[in-house]
């Protein structure tokens, strides 16, 4: 008996694919993980080695060694050292939010021209800088915790790969696009850059989620509830549902049966009541649908496009004057969605302290980390006297927050909730930055004086 392939098999798709394999090397096996490779990529076991970094608790006129970092604290330190310390202490956060440098190659200063930080790392150095810190954050994040990484377009793709590598691709929750500013009519050679992004990952399969809701805008309401009558604005929905039923909801109503494979959502008696009250709409072809009226408490969930959280864009918005300060309402939404009262929230690049402020208002515990002296002073000033309207930072007749009219200071101060505020500094920073430490102590004295 002859054995072999017939002409159809020889010329068929399977045979052609086999020939193509000889022309192109085999693809990686299904399920193979993607990793980033670059010079200087440190072994994870080295990153997770415990460091014996001593931290000093700072007071108005002292700085003494502390065995434990308390909740509701700002840590003035390199965040890799501080995160390692929190890991060693066994701290567990339900939420970590970070707004790190974006690899822009730029320096950033405040509205009063005080230097805040340099964003000078690029490519491999930037990725390894972030990787080492994200690995430590993974260890600190609780099993039902969530991490939000706020980033620009510059390293978005690379950071997505990095987060997939560290947390697992299956732990990806969302890529949120945020409208950060108004239209830029001056852009000529490319599309205007109006957005930045938030990568959201969970530590485990289950995570805290308190679904945030908002009031729909007029455009959405007009599309969703396009009809009106004497009772108000309404939309039409079917009165049948999938599935065959053999009871009353599968029988006749007003001489007609449900469509094939479906049943009435209500009994014929209930449908009669709805029809008599004018809550059934009959089309010209005799198709009945139920009217669903718009209610005053109507709310909808957020999508992954956030256009209502632009950064300060008019002069009445309250700000600290810190560069890259993020929208405070956005921070309250994130903290509320991914943590519960009493949970620990950590921001390792805390800058102006928006995350800490939101956590405090929503009765969460918090820890903020930043190595910038200006960030440290900004956070303490924020907790002492609150923020100021943005217009005051361009009004030369006022000396920023310190010379605001009392009424404005009192209004801003009402944002603050707790008097519980601690500040720590690592021993090395304290020893080599004595003048800066003195500034920190002065700011701390001012904070405590304003909290009386």
UniProtKB/Swiss-Prot annotation:
GO cellular component term, pick one: cytoplasm
EC number(s) on file: 2.1.1.72
Keywords: DNA-binding, Methyltransferase, Restriction system, S-adenosyl-L-methionine, Transferase
Domain of life: Bacteria
GO molecular function, one term: DNA binding
Gene3D superfamilies noted in UniProt: Vaccinia Virus protein VP39
Pfam families: N6_N4_Mtase (PF01555)
GO process annotations (BP): DNA restriction-modification system; methylation
Catalytic activity: a 2'-deoxyadenosine in DNA + S-adenosyl-L-methionine = an N(6)-methyl-2'-deoxyadenosine in DNA + S-adenosyl-L-homocysteine + H(+)
Family statement drawn from the similarity comment of this UniProt entry: Belongs to the N(4)/N(6)-methyltransferase family.
Protein name: Type II methyltransferase M.EcaI
Encoding gene, per UniProt annotation: ecaIM
């Amino acid at each position: 008996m002859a054995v072999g392939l017939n002409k159809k098999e020889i010329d068929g798709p399977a045979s052609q694919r086999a020939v193509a394999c000889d022309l192109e090397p085999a693809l990686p096996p299904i399920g193979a993980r993607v990793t980033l490779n670059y010079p200087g990529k440190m072994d994870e076991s080295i990153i997770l080695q415990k460091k014996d970094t001593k931290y000093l608790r700072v007071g108005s006129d002292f700085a003494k060694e502390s065995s434990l970092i308390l909740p509701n604290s700002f840590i003035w330190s390199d965040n890799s050292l501080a995160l390692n310390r929190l890991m060693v202490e066994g701290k567990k956060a339900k939420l970590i939010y970070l707004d790190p440098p974006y690899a822009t190659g730029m320096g950033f200063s405040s509205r009063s021209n005080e230097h805040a930080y340099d964003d000078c790392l690029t490519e491999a150095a930037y990725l390894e800088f972030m990787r080492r810190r994200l690995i430590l954050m993974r260890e600190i994040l609780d099993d039902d915790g969530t991490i939000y990484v706020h980033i620009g377009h510059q390293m978005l793709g690379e950071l997505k790969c990095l987060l997939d590598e560290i947390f697992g691709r299956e732990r990806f929750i969302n890529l949120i696009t945020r409208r950060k500013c108004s239209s830029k009519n001056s852009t000529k050679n490319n599309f205007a850059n109006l957005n930045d992004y938030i990568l959201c990952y969970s530590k485990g399969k289950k995570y805290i989620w308190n679904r945030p809701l908002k009031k729909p805008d007029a455009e959405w309401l007009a599309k969703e509830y396009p009809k009106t009558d004497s009772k108000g604005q309404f939309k039409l929905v079917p009165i049948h549902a999938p599935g065959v039923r053999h009871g009353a909801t599968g029988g006749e109503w007003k001489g007609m049966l449900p469509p094939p494979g479906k049943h009435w959502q209500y009994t014929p008696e209930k449908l009669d009541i709805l029809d008599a009250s004018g809550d059934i709409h009959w089309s010209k072809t005799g198709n009945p649908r139920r009217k669903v009226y718009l209610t005053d408490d109507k709310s909808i969930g957020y999508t992954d496009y956030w256009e209502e959280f632009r950064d300060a864009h008019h002069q009445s918005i309250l700000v600290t004057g810190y560069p890259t300060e993020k929208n405070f309402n956005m921070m309250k939404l994130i903290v509320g969605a991914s943590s519960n009262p009493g949970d620990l929230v950590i921001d390792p690049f805390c800058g102006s302290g928006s995350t800490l402020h939101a956590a405090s208002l929503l009765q969460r515990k918090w820890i903020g980390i930043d190595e910038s002296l200006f960030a440290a002073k900004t956070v303490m000033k924020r907790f002492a006297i609150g923020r100021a309207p943005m217009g005051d930072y361009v009004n030369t007749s006022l000396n920023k927050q310190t010379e605001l009219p009392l009424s404005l200071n009192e209004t801003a101060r009402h944002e603050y909730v707790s008097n519980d505020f601690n500040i720590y500094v690592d021993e090395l920073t304290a020893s080599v930055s004595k003048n800066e430490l003195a500034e920190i102590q002065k700011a701390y004295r001012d904070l405590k004086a304003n909290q009386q």
